[in-house]
């Protein structure tokens, strides 16, 4: 698959794997011991990748963090890249429908993206994971390069027509620029929030940016004295 080809399935990136057993939309009656072990490995990989990045972590590190032997991890995953694919795909099972399933409801897409920002404030490990991996993945040789390339392409493809409708009649910014600004704002806020979480209100900053464009959300900002932090 070429870099310009984007999956249209239930993922925001290029990676496809079987559905994780923790997908809340499709719960199972029970999980086998092997599935529970796989989830433990994915948890361990996600924690280590978020803390140290992908390249600084070995499969043996993941095994030790999961309380398993190296051979035990290899029984479930052939290599470190396979664990990365599952770590990224697990979250996409939750986030992708919020972006891909809204259809022509442009207001719903904006509301859902604001909800994702809000939810990210409760998952610092995940935010750290994406910040570290997206920076590393600018290298075309990185195993997550195509994933993040496609993720940004898909977000822009959905945001540009949304801003075209919501900004109708405004000469500036163009829908393309507004989409780029929105994504850049989210990414930059995440870095600042990781450095100084108590001083950064990511959701408030995103909603405020949208207001400067004349766009309101279904859940507006509370008065300043009622905001957290």
PLM regions: where:
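N-terminal intrinsically disordered/low-complexity leader segments
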Residues: 1-36, 219-229
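Helix-turn-helix
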Residues: 37-40, 44-82, 86
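Hydrophobic alpha-helical connector segments
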Residues: 86, 97-127, 169, 178-182
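Amphipathic C-terminal alpha-helical segment
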Residues: 135, 182-200, 212-222
């Amino acid at each position: 698959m070429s870099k310009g080809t984007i999956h249209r399935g239930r993922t925001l990136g290029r990676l496809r794997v079987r559905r994780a057993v923790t997908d809340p939309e499709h719960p199972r009656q029970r999980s086998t011991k092997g599935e529970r072990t796989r989830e433990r490995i994915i948890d361990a990989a996600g924690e280590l990748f978020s803390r140290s990045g992908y390249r600084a972590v070995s499969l043996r590190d993941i095994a030790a963090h999961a309380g398993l032997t190296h051979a035990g991890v290899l029984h479930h995953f052939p290599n470190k890249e396979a664990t990365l694919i599952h770590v990224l795909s697990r979250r996409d099972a939750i986030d992708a429908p919020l972006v891909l399933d809204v259809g022509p409801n442009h207001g719903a897409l904006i509301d859902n993206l604001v909800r994702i920002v809000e939810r990210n404030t409760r998952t610092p490990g995940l935010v750290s994971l994406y910040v570290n991996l997206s920076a590393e993945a600018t290298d075309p040789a990185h195993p997550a390069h195509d994933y993040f390339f496609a993720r940004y392409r898909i977000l822009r493809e959905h945001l540009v027509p949304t801003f075209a409708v919501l900004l109708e009649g405004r000469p500036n910014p163009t829908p393309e620029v507004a989409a780029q600004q929105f994504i850049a704002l989210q990414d930059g806020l995440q870095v600042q929030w990781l450095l100084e979480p108590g001083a950064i209100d990511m959701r408030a900053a995103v909603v405020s940016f949208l207001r400067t464009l004349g766009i309101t959300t279904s859940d507006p900002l509370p008065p300043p004295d009622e905001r957290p932090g």
